Design a protein with these regions (language model features):
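N-terminal regions of proteins, emphasizing targeting and processing segments when present
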Residues: 58, 284, 303-306
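A short, glycine- and basic residue-enriched loop/turn
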Residues: 47, 112, 268-269
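Flexible "cap/lid" subdomain of the alpha/beta-hydrolase fold that forms the substrate-access gate
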Residues: 1-13, 20-24, 28-30, 36, ...
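Alpha/beta-hydrolase-fold serine-hydrolase catalytic core, especially in secreted/extracellular enzymes
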Residues: 291-306, 311-313
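Conserved HGGG/HGGXW glycine-rich cap/lid loop of the alpha/beta-hydrolase fold
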Residues: 27-73
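Histidine-centered active-site/metal-ligand motif
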Residues: 23, 41, 270
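Catalytic histidine-centered segment of alpha/beta-hydrolase-like enzymes
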Residues: 268-277, 281
Length: 313
C-alpha cells in the first residue's frame, strides 16, 4: 500500500469519551485569537478528508478535526453508534476544548452531526460551510446504499470485503476516475479489518428508512432547528454529480437559509473537496475574510437526542 502519512502532517490528540478514545487534530497559528474552524467528516472518510484545507488554512485559523468514534484513528466500539451518539461525542469535544466563534465545516454525515451539535450549543456557532450533506429525514435512499443494507450480504460486503470504502474512492468523484494511490491508501488505512469497519457499517445501518427509526426523529429535530441558524453566514458548495446528496438537498438548505452563499459545481462529485480543490479553497478563503464572526446568537438550544431507544435496526 502506498505511503499516505506524509499527506497527513498533523499531531494526533485524544479525548476519552465513555471509555473510548476519540482522535482529533488541533492545528493553530501562534495567534489563535480568531476563528476556530471545526471540520466534521462523513462516512466512510475520516479527518484525512480535510488535510489539504487544513494545511492551507491553519496559518490563520485554529483548525480542529475529529474522527468520530468508529472512524479514522479513533477507537472502534463494538456496539452500534447512532446519529445522536455522534452528536453527543462531538458536543463533548467542543465543550472539552471550549471551542467558541466556531465556523462549522462539514460534509456528508458530518452535516447532520455538526449541525446537531451546534443546535445544542448555538452560542458557540458563528458561521457554516457545508459540502454535499443533509440535515433532515431523507426523501430517498439511493439503490447503492440500499444494497449495502441487505441482511447478511450487506454486512459481508461493507464490513467484510470493505466494498463500501473501496467503491467510495471512485464513486464519489466526477472529474477524475482515480485518486492518487497515496491518497486512496490514506482513506482506506483506518479500515483494514472487520473490527475496524464496524463504524462504516454502523453509519450505513443508521440511515433511517421511516419515521419509526430513532435517527429519523433526530434528523427531524435538527431540521426543525435549522431556521434558528438563518442569521449565521453560510457557504454551501455542491458537486452536482453526486448520486447521494442530490441538488434537492441543497435546495432544502437554501429554503431555510435564503441568505446563504451557494456555489454549484456542475462537473464535481460527492467528495467535492477532493474533486475540485482549486475552486473550493478560494470560496472558503473569501467567505472567511468577508463574513462576520459576531453573528446573532439568539437561538435557543435544541434537543437533538433520539426519543426512541431500543429500536432494533
Amino acid at each position: 500500500m502506498a505511503n499516505w502519512r506524509s499527506l497527513y502532517p498533523f499531531a494526533s490528540r485524544f479525548i476519552s469519551i465513555g471509555g473510548a478514545r476519540m482522535h482529533y487534530m488541533d492545528e493553530a497559528p501562534v495567534d489563535a485569537s480568531g476563528a476556530t474552524l471545526l471540520f466534521v467528516h462523513g462516512n466512510p472518510t475520516w479527518s484525512f478528508h480535510w488535510r489539504r484545507l487544513i494545511v492551507a488554512l491553519r496559518s490563520k485559523y485554529r483548525c480542529v478535526a475529529p474522527d468520530h468514534l468508529g472512524c479514522g484513528l479513533s477507537d472502534k466500539p463494538a456496539h452500534l453508534l447512532r446519529l445522536t451518539d455522534h452528536i453527543d461525542n462531538l458536543s463533548a469535544l467542543i465543550e472539552h476544548l471550549d471551542l467558541r466563534s466556531i465556523t462549522l465545516v462539514a460534509q456528508d454525515w458530518g452535516g447532520a452531526i455538526g449541525l446537531g451539535a451546534m443546535l445544542r450549543l448555538p452560542e458557540r456557532l458563528s458561521r457554516m460551510v457545508l459540502f454535499n450533506t443533509g440535515a433532515f429525514p431523507p426523501r430517498y435512499i439511493p439503490w447503492r446504499i440500499r444494497a449495502c443494507r441487505i441482511p447478511i450480504l450487506g454486512q459481508l460486503a461493507v464490513q467484510g470485503a470493505n466494498l463500501f470504502s473501496r467503491a467510495a474512492l471512485r464513486m464519489t468523484l466526477a472529474r477524475t476516475s482515480r485518486l492518487d494511490p497515496a491518497v486512496a491508501a490514506g482513506y482506506l488505512a483506518p479500515y483494514d479489518s472487520w473490527a475496524n469497519r464496524r463504524g462504516v457499517y454502523g453509519f450505513v445501518k443508521d440511515i433511517p428508512s421511516g419515521p419509526r427509526h430513532p435517527t429519523w426523529q433526530t434528523l427531524a429535530k435538527i431540521e426543525s432547528g435549522l431556521p434558528m441558524l438563518a442569521d449565521r453566514p453560510s457557504l454551501l458548495v455542491w458537486g452536482l454529480r453526486d448520486w447521494c446528496f442530490l441538488p434537492d438537498c441543497l435546495a432544502r438548505f437554501e429554503e431555510v437559509w435564503p441568505q446563504a452563499e451557494a456555489h454549484r459545481l456542475a462537473d464535481a462529485g460527492h467528495w467535492v473537496v477532493e474533486d475540485a480543490p482549486d475552486e473550493v479553497l478560494p470560496y472558503i478563503q473569501r467567505f472567511l475574510l468577508t463574513t462576520d464572526l459576531t453573528a446573532s446568537r439568539s437561538a435557543r438550544p435544541v434537543d437533538t437526542s433520539s426519543a426512541a431507544p431500543g429500536y432494533n435496526n
